[in-house]
């Protein structure tokens, strides 16, 4: 948005004051998306008065990962924050996930001297649910596991828990899914699953349906079909 002429520090304090007036124990839950929350709006707020949701941490983390497109040098400063997975955009239905990045990002944040001090947990921030349940299972196990693990290791246990059997065919199928369509690479910042070209405006050079989507495979389709 356009912040021209807005005293962001004063605006942030006004919001905080209004919340505290209604409830002295109020905590401002705020989303981290692109340039928001603006640094001047939050830098002078008291520690403990705010919880920042790192909305798209599995793809564009803002807690301080220097490889991120939305890198913040100082992360969320003194404020508490949650490591969140967005995963689903617009309620689109399709297989998609970033298993390795989700796992490594969480443990990288735990190992970071600054980010680890204020990380309070994990969260989900999807625009649609009832698909890709394996990703939510994975996310919510992260805080319970002290040591870093691989997606391949985790999927072995997931298969046994889900199907109550140690079937080799099931293991093979999930290992293929976990290494392909559920392991979108770091450089892919598409917003959720592939979109159908039939949803795009007709044209001779159409290859995606929306500005932030993809239709080009980052995996071998033979591993999914």
PLM region descriptions:
Residues 1-178, 183-191, 198-224:
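Catalytic-core regions of glycoside hydrolase
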């Amino acid at each position: 948005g356009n912040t021209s002429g807005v005293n962001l520090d004063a605006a942030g304090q006004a919001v905080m004051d209004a919340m505290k007036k209604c409830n002295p124990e109020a905590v401002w839950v705020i989303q981290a998306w692109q340039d928001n929350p603006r640094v001047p709006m939050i830098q002078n707020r008291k520690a403990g008065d705010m919880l920042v949701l790192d909305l798209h941490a599995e793809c564009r983390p803002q807690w301080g990962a220097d490889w991120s497109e939305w890198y913040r040098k100082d992360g969320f400063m003194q404020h508490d924050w949650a490591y969140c997975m967005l995963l689903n955009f617009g309620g689109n239905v399709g297989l998609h996930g970033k298993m390795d990045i989700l796992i490594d990002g969480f443990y990288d944040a735990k190992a970071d001297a600054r980010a680890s001090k204020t990380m309070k947990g994990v969260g989900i921030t999807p625009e649609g649910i009832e698909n890709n349940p394996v990703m939510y299972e994975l996310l919510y196990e992260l805080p319970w596991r002290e040591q870093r693990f691989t997606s391949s290791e985790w999927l072995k246990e997931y298969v046994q828990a889900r199907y109550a059997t140690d079937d080799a065919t099931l293991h093979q199928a999930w290992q293929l899914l976990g290494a392909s369509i559920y392991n979108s690479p770091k450089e892919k910042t598409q917003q959720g699953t592939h979109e159908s070209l039939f949803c795009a405006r007709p044209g001779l050079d159409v290859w995606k349906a929306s500005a932030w989507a993809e239709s080009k495979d980052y995996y071998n389709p033979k591993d999914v079909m």
